[in-house]
C-alpha cells in the first residue's frame, strides 16, 4: 500500500514539474519572439514629436496626496501649461488646476475609474491628447507625442527605501520590454497608467465607465475591440516610485494579476487563451527557481530526468537574461541596477509571488500603492542629491549618480556595522 502511495506521489510530482516546465518554456519562447523579433524598431524615440505641448492636457490622478502631487506638477516641463489634478478630496496644488470629484457622482466605474470618468465628462479639454500621470510619476525627456491613439510611455522606477522591491522592479522592467511589440498586436496585452497619452476623441468614444481594477488595460482592450487601435510606445523613461515595502509590492502584483484576469472576457477567444496561458505561467513562475534548485541539490527527489534538468537549467538562465534586459533599460540612467543580476532567483520569486497570490485568492477592489515624499526619497536614495528630484524639469533626463560613501555608510548602518 505504501509503495502504491509513493508511486502516486511521484507521479503527481512529475505531472506538476512537467506542467510548470512546459508552460514556462512556452512563455519564455513567446517573450523572446516579442522582444527580439516583433519589437524590432517599434519603440518611438523621445524626440520623434508630431504633437507639441500646446496639443496636450496633463491629468494627474490622486485621492488627496497633495505633497506627492506637488512634486509631480513641479516636474511638468515649462510650456506644458494645461495641467489638471483630479482628486477625490479638495486639495491645494501650485501650478495646476485642481478638480475634486463630487461625492454624489456615481457611475459604473469605481475608485480610480470613477475619477477618470468624472473628469472625462466634466473637465473641459480642447487638446488633441490627454496625458495621464500617476500621482508619483516624474516626467523626463518629454518633448511631445508621436502619432497614435494610445501612446504608452516607458518607465524606470526609483529606489524609495527597499532594495528588494527596487531590484525586483528592475526584473519587471526587463520583462516589460515585450510591451514594445504590442503595436503589432490587435490587442495590447496590458497598459501602464502612470504615463499614458490617449487621443481625446478616442477617450470620449470609449469612456472610462467600466467596472475594473486595472483601468488602463481595460480601456485599451475596449478601444481595440471598438476600432483598429494605433498603439505606440514612446521611450521617455518617466520615473515613478518602486513600492516602499515587499508587502506593498505583493499586493500591487496581486491586483494587477486579478484585474487582468477578470477583464480577459473583453478579448477575442484566441487572445483570451493566449492571455490565460501567460497568466498561469506568470502565477507559477516562482516555482521555476525552486524546482531547478531541488533537482540539482537533491538528485533523488525525482527520477533521473536528464532532459528536464538541462531544460530547467536553460530556463533558469533565461531569468538572468530578463534581468539583463532590465539593467539595459536603466543603463543610461543608472548602473546601480547591476546589483539585481546576482539576486535574480530571489527577485523572481518575490516579484511574481503576488501573481500566485492573485491566482489563488483574487482581489476585486482597487487599492492605492503607498507613495513616499520626494524629499524622503532624496534622503534615502544614495543616487540622488537634495533637489535633484524635487527641482527636476520634465524636459530633461533624470540620471542617477551613485554616491558610494552614502551607499556604503547606509548599508553599514542597516547591518549595525560601525568603524572602530
Identify the residue ranges that each predicted region occupies.
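Catalytic donor-sugar/metal-binding loop of nucleotide-sugar-dependent glycosyltransferases
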Residues: 221-239
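Short, well-formed alpha-helical segments that are part of the catalytic scaffolds
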Residues: 39-46, 64-80
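Acidic donor-binding loop at a coil-to-helix junction in glycosyltransferase catalytic cores
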Residues: 213-219
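Acidic donor-binding segment of Leloir-type glycosyltransferases
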Residues: 73-107
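Short beta-strand-to-loop acidic/aromatic patch adjacent to the donor-nucleotide binding site
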Residues: 125-140
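Juxtamembrane C-terminal module of membrane proteins
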Residues: 1, 21-54, 83-85, 89-91, ...
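Cell-envelope/extracellular polymer assembly enzymes that use nucleotide-activated donors
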Residues: 54-59, 82, 218
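Long helical/loop segments within the catalytic core of UDP-sugar-dependent glycosyltransferases
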Residues: 106-123, 127, 143-211, 250, ...
Amino acid at each position: 500500500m505504501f509503495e502504491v502511495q509513493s508511486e502516486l506521489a511521484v507521479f503527481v510530482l512529475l505531472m506538476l514539474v512537467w506542467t510548470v516546465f512546459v508552460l514556462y518554456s512556452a512563455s519564455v519562447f513567446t517573450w523572446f519572439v516579442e522582444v527580439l523579433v516583433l519589437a524590432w524598431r517599434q519603440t518611438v524615440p523621445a524626440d520623434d514629436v508630431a504633437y507639441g505641448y500646446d496639443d496636450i492636457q496633463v491629468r494627474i490622478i490622486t485621492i488627496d496626496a497633495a505633497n506627492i502631487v506637488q512634486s509631480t506638477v513641479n516636474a511638468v516641463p515649462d510650456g506644458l501649461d494645461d495641467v489638471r489634478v483630479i482628486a477625490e478630496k479638495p486639495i491645494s496644488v501650485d501650478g495646476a488646476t485642481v478638480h475634486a470629484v463630487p461625492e454624489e457622482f456615481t457611475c459604473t466605474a469605481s475608485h480610480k475609474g470613477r475619477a477618470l470618468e468624472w473628469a472625462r465628462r466634466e473637465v473641459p479639454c480642447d487638446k488633441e491628447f490627454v496625458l495621464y500621470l500617476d500621482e508619483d510619476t516624474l516626467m523626463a525627456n518629454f518633448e511631445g507625442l508621436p502619432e497614435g491613439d494610445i501612446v504608452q510611455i516607458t518607465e524606470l522606477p526609483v529606489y524609495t527605501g527597499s532594495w528588494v522591491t527596487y531590484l525586483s522592479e528592475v526584473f519587471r522592467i526587463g520583462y516589460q520590454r515585450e510591451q514594445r511589440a504590442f503595436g503589432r498586436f490587435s490587442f495590447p496585452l496590458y497598459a501602464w497608467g502612470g504615463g499614458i497619452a490617449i487621443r481625446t476623441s478616442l477617450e470620449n468614444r470609449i469612456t472610462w465607465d467600466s467596472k475594473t481594477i486595472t483601468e488602463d488595460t481595460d480601456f485599451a482592450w475596449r478601444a481595440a475591440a471598438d476600432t483598429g487601435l494605433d498603439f505606440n510606445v514612446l521611450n521617455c523613461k518617466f520615473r515613478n516610485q518602486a513600492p516602499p515595502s515587499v508587502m506593498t509590492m505583493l499586493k500591487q502584483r496581486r491586483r494587477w494579476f486579478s484585474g487582468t484576469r477578470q477583464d480577459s472576457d473583453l478579448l477575442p477567444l484566441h487572445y483570451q487563451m493566449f492571455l490565460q496561458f501567460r497568466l498561469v505561467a506568470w502565477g507559477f513562475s516562482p516555482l521555476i527557481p525552486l524546482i531547478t534548485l531541488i533537482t540539482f541539490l537533491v538528485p533523488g527527489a525525482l527520477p533521473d530526468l536528464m532532459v528536464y534538468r538541462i531544460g530547467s537549467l536553460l530556463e533558469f538562465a533565461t531569468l538572468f537574461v530578463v534581468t539583463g534586459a532590465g539593467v539595459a533599460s536603466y543603463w543610461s540612467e543608472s548602473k546601480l541596477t547591476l546589483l539585481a543580476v546576482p539576486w535574480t532567483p530571489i527577485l523572481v520569486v518575490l516579484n511574481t509571488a503576488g501573481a500566485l497570490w492573485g491566482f489563488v485568492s483574487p482581489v476585486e477592489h482597487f487599492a492605492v500603492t503607498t507613495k513616499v515624499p520626494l524629499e524622503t526619497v532624496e534622503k534615502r536614495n544614495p543616487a540622488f542629491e537634495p533637489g535633484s528630484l524635487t527641482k527636476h524639469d520634465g524636459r530633461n533626463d533624470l540620471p542617477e549618480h551613485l554616491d558610494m560613501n552614502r551607499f556604503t555608510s547606509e548599508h553599514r548602518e542597516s547591518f549595525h556595522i560601525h568603524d572602530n
